[in-house]
């Protein structure tokens, strides 16, 4: 929905001057105004920008708190003390937020989702491969049955590998981590 500055201020329950300040901080504008012409904002883009801004501010607060706790010297923190527990909680919150941001940005993908996608792709590939011998036979009627059998055998092997792809993801992840660590 496209709105002017006054309406956007009402949506966020802030003063229109706050919207102007946000513009200087990067609030996206659907069309910039000029003398006598109002600026127009896309509410979806504005809400997304605001949410990201708030997330960044919260992350910065958590990082600062974490740095303050580290400055207090991690070695001074004794398990069971309130400072130690606060440090653990803050660190866990910061890590969780960074992981959430990475997931939202598409940098991190859950293994279950990746496995599901890989299995779907493998099924589609297998479906195409199974039709290859019939396509060859129709396109080249003179092809010998022994040649078709060889093609069918190789396609069956490839289809079996594709079918097991979802089962192999865990092992492949371990292989990747070992290779990445070396």
Curated annotation (Swiss-Prot):
Subcellular location: Host cytoplasm
Physiological role: Component of the terminase that processes and encapsidates viral genomes during virion assembly. The terminase is composed of two small and one large subunits. To initiate packaging, it binds a specific sequence, at the junction of adjacent viral genomes in the concatemeric DNA substrate. Next, in a reaction stimulated by the presence of proheads and ATP but not requiring ATP hydrolysis, the terminase creates two nicks at a specific site, one on each stand. Terminase then separates the cohesive ends in a reaction requiring ATP hydrolysis.
Coiled coil: 51-105
Keywords per UniProt: ATP-binding, Coiled coil, DNA-binding, Host cytoplasm, Nucleotide-binding, Viral genome packaging, Viral release from host cell
Subunit structure: Heterotrimer of two small and one large terminase subunits. The active complex may be composed of five heterotrimers.
Major localization listed first in the record, in broad terms: host cell
A GO cellular component annotation in the UniProt record: host cell cytoplasm
Protein name (Swiss-Prot/TrEMBL): Terminase, small subunit
Pfam family, one: Phage_Nu1
Family indicated by similarity: Belongs to the terminase small subunit family.
InterPro entries the record matches: DNA-bd_dom_put_sf, Phage_lambda_Nu1_terminase-ssu, WH-like_DNA-bd_sf
SUPFAM superfamilies: Putative DNA-binding domain
Binding, ATP: 31-36
MF term (GO), any: DNA binding
Gene coding for it: 1
